């Protein structure tokens, strides 16, 4: 995004001193997010049970958004050098968590970038399908699918009661 602003300023002959303030305005606006109604409570429940990492192709800042306390790590494609669905960014996140990729559940809302990408990289995939879309890949099916983050937290509570002790370790 910064490079796009820089290019636009150069092409228009504008003052390049505007680059930093313009990017800061964009970045501040980018980090003003509206949470889904279930997101905060569910994220708190999940993070209390499991180590959670944020993996993003975007440039959101968990500190600015106010969610950093729920995540052990934040991995962004720009810093990593590759983006989802490339396997290396999923693998790097697993390494940061110290968890074998076969034991990591990647939760995402984009069928290809998140779920299929994670599964091709050797992780388990959970599709957060809030809009009721139809899965289109006949060769690969998500391990789990939920319409809300609360449903995932409920599933973890019901099926994985031993995980709370692991999260504290």
Q: Predicted regions span which residues?
A:
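Active-site periphery "cap/insert" segments of enzyme catalytic domains
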Residues: 32-38
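Alpha-helix C-capping/helix-to-loop hinge sites
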Residues: 8-12, 29, 77-78
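A metal-dependent, Asp-based hydrolase signature
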Residues: 1-24
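Asp-based, Mg2+/Mn2+-dependent phosphohydrolase catalytic module
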Residues: 14-16, 40, 44, 48-169
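Surface-exposed cleft-lining segments at the edges of enzyme active sites
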Residues: 24-32
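Conserved donor sugar-nucleotide recognition element shared by glycan-biosynthetic enzymes
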Residues: 1, 35, 86
């Amino acid at each position: 995004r910064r490079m796009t602003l820089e290019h636009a300023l150069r092409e228009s002959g504008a003052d390049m001193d505007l680059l930093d303030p313009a990017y800061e305005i964009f970045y501040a606006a980018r980090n003003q997010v509206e949470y889904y109604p279930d997101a905060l409570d569910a994220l708190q429940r999940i993070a209390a049970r499991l180590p959670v990492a944020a993996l993003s192709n975007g440039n959101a800042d968990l500190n600015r958004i106010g969610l950093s306390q729920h995540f052990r790590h934040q991995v962004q494609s720009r810093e990593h050098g590759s983006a989802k669905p490339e396997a290396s960014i999923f693998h790097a996140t697993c390494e940061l968590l110290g968890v074998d990729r076969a034991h990591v559940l990647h939760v995402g809302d984009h069928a290809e970038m998140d779920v299929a990408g994670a599964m091709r990289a050797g992780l388990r995939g959970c599709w957060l399908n809030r809009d009721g879309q139809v899965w289109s890949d006949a060769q690969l099916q998500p391990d789990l699918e939920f319409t809300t983050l609360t449903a995932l937290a409920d599933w973890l509570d019901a099926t994985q009661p031993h995980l709370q002790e692991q999260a504290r370790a």
